[in-house]
């Protein structure tokens, strides 16, 4: 089985571009690849999904123990001929930027994957070898097995490849040229989502064409051939006992594939709906999940869907088990100011008014602790979470305590009760008791309302 992790020395080096190019080329070659993302990012897996037509999974060593990550990787790789992991940020950048824990290197080390380093040789030649030498020798083993040049001309590749191979003792496996016609734009939370990129499939095809032409496939495939990961014994998915409505559209698109799988494994049927377009919730539901996304970019359309706003408010107030993260939390507030500064009424079950803070707010990983029992949490428990948002609310809640793992910054957040969780923190549900608790609350609600 072909297995590797793509990494770089920094963000913005073209990891996502290279990942999509290689995935598409592997797909053309009949390898039936699957994809993974190191860390908590939601957007890059959307591009993997656009290439493959199947889910891409997140593997995060802050969210999950090593054995859980290995199991998630094996489960996702089962039945595929290639598994491609995309790293996050710089190769060794982990918690707080001062630790290698939860870094791309940590993931490669945990899974035993060869690493292909994506390098953009802008304004450098021999100095590039010195920098790469530092990356290779910073940790032992580094797992770095090869180099891929990005935004590189054929002429520069001919010059750099033999020099880097001589200095580093590592193979240069090819390059991608600059492709202005295949550029994917970005905004305040990173890249545009895959659904928003015009002519995405044509851009992906251009990337794959370039990869076919300029990558040394025989060497890459030979270098990255490994035994498939061992799949732990998987319990059978139980029959669905309750329906959970999950918001999914352009405004609410930040849901981990593993979370939805965990809902199903807990006995729930996942039923998607669009807060932008559907005028009512799905019928006979026992729970409601509102993930994050970009509601601030669609505030007017969300606000004008008044029949759905009214129904969600009524159902939550009548006890419908509900979990709302980040953008979902904003949706449940009193109002949401859009990117143009216009304020729009929202569901109104929470007191806060939200607007652009003009900066990243409480960015990064944290541990979320509960003081008392509620639908999802038990007193004294702590769960890993992350926050990633520019919008903030006048009422973020005070029910839970959040604390960063590095530096110790702490704050109160979230609103909870026996049928409710809402807050800025994104939860990672897989491998925790949270899906079972949510499904149980949904079953109880359904039983009381049938």
Task: Please identify what each model-predicted range represents.
Residues 195-240, 248-252, 419-450:
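Acyltransferase
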Residues 125-236:
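Internal gly/pro-rich beta-alpha loop/helix module
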Residues 108, 238-239, 252-265, 269-271, ...:
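C-terminal and late-domain segments of enzyme folds
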Residues 295-374:
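Cysteine-nucleophile active-site neighborhood
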Residues 1-2, 237-243:
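A short, charged/proline- and glycine-enriched loop
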Residues 2-17, 23-111, 119-146, 155-158:
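ATP-dependent carboxylate-amine ligase catalytic core
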Residues 37-38, 172-180, 269-277:
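Beta-strand->loop->alpha-helix junctions that form or flank phosphate-binding loops
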Residues 240-317:
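Phosphate-binding active sites in nucleotide-utilizing proteins
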């Amino acid at each position: 089985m072909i297995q590797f992790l793509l990494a770089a020395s920094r963000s913005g080096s073209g990891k996502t571009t290279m990942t999509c190019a290689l995935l598409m080329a592997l797909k053309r070659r009949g390898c039936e690849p699957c994809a993974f993302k190191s860390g908590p990012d939601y957007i890059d897996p959307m591009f993997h999904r656009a290439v493959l037509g199947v889910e891409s999974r997140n593997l995060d060593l802050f969210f999950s123990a090593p054995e859980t990550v290995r199991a998630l990787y094996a489960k996702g790789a089962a039945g595929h001929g290639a598994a491609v992991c995309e790293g996050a940020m710089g190769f060794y950048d982990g918690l707080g930027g001062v630790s290698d824990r939860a870094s791309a290197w940590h993931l490669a080390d945990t899974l035993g994957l060869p690493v292909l380093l994506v390098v953009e040789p802008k304004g450098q030649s021999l100095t590039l070898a010195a920098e790469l030498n530092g990356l290779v020798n910073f940790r032992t083993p580094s797992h770095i097995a090869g180099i891929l040049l990005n935004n590189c001309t054929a002429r520069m590749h001919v010059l750099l490849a033999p020099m880097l191979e001589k200095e580093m003792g590592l193979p240069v496996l090819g390059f991608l040229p600059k492709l202005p016609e295949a550029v994917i734009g970005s905004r305040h939370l990173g890249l545009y989502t895959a659904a928003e990129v015009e002519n995405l499939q044509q851009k992906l095809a251009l990337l794959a064409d370039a990869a076919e032409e300029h990558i040394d496939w025989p060497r890459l495939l030979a270098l990255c051939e490994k035994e498939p990961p061992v799949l732990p014994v998987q319990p059978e998915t139980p029959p669905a006992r309750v329906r959970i409505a999950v918001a999914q559209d352009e405004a609410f698109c930040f849901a981990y594939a593993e979370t939805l799988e965990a809902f199903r494994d807990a006995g729930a049927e996942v039923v998607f709906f669009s807060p932008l377009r559907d005028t009512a919730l799905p019928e006979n539901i026992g729970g409601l999940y509102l993930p994050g996304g970009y509601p601030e970019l669609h505030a007017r359309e969300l606000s004008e869907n008044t029949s759905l706003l009214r129904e969600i408010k009524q159902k939550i107030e009548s006890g419908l088990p509900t979990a709302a993260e980040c953008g979902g939390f904003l949706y449940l507030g009193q109002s949401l100011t859009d990117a143009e500064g216009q304020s729009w009424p929202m569901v109104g079950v929470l007191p806060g008014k939200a607007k652009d803070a003009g900066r990243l707010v409480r960015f990064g990983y944290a541990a979320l602790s509960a003081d008392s029992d509620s639908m999802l949490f038990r007193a004294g428990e702590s769960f890993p979470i992350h926050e990633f948002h520019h919008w903030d609310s006048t009422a973020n809640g005070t029910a839970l305590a959040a604390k960063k793992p590095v530096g110790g910054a702490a704050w109160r957040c979230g609103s909870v009760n026996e049928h409710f969780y809402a807050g800025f923190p994104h939860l990672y549900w897989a491998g925790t008791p949270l899906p079972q608790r949510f499904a149980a609350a949904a079953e109880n609600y359904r039983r009381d309302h049938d």
